[in-house]
Amino acid sequence: MRTLACFVAAGMLALSASAANAETVAYGEAFDTLFRIDLAGHTAAEVGPAGFYGSQRIGNLSGLSYSLDDDLYAVVGGMNALSRIDASDGSATILGNLGLAGQGDPQRNDALDLGMTFSCDGTLWLVSAYAGKLWTVNPQNGATTLVGNTGHTITGLVALGNTLFGAGGRDDNTFYRIDTDSGAATAIGSFGDAPSTWINSVSMSFDEKGTLWAVLNYVPPAPGSVSVPDWSDLAKINVSTGEITIVGPIIGPESLIQVGMKGFAVGPPRCQTGAGTAILTPVGSPPWLAGLAALLVALAGWTLRGRAIR
């Protein structure tokens, strides 16, 4: 029994070391192209374009979000549709129409300016900065169900567990908590003084440690302005106060210059389900790591039961 206990302890140490060294995967969408983002260096490397749906380019992507199965989803603003994104090459598969035609800006081809995120109960949430509405979305076919009006210009969504947060922008530099029953947004706090430029949209994602990362997009600029920063900014948001801390510009290839990044997703925390011991396995870990974690938990439980019997 002592030998088994030593094995379990050694395995847990190895698991901890491997998890600590596991790379946190982050992605961003810029119009029609997926980029892999290095959070430490705030740099972007092109993965690939979304491609075409028939003869139509799949573009104006936003609301990049991981499902509970670690699949990437995004909204296709140019088609008013839901898509699934292949993280290996950036290609998009159209899943269905959102059914929201006629609710967007008539001066911009019915643009709704959409944000999206999954919560830990598997619900897919969708928000429109233009229409000021919150919907749920069927991940299988894109069908939407109206929840209610947010009452504010919400440009991005993110969930921590089943708690929904929204970020303003466009002269509403405020971080909000959103009621999932009514859609109403309640202010948590201001972004603070760090964002010195007009923000068009804020894309957000929590990492496995609970840090809220954000991408600040400045394209298109404020009405009447022609000045556009070359790069979107990587930032962090204090969930308790709403204050933004800018990490730095997300520098990438020339093709990314002055192209706003409107979708952003960090490899998601594992949502805890069911009873028993929860093991956090960061995204990007090799498949055997989760199996090892489960095996070690089972062995540890068997060891403890053996001691109790004796």
Across the structure, where does each feature detected by a protein language model lie?
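Conserved beta-propeller blade signature
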Residues: 25-29, 71-75, 123-126, 164-167, ...
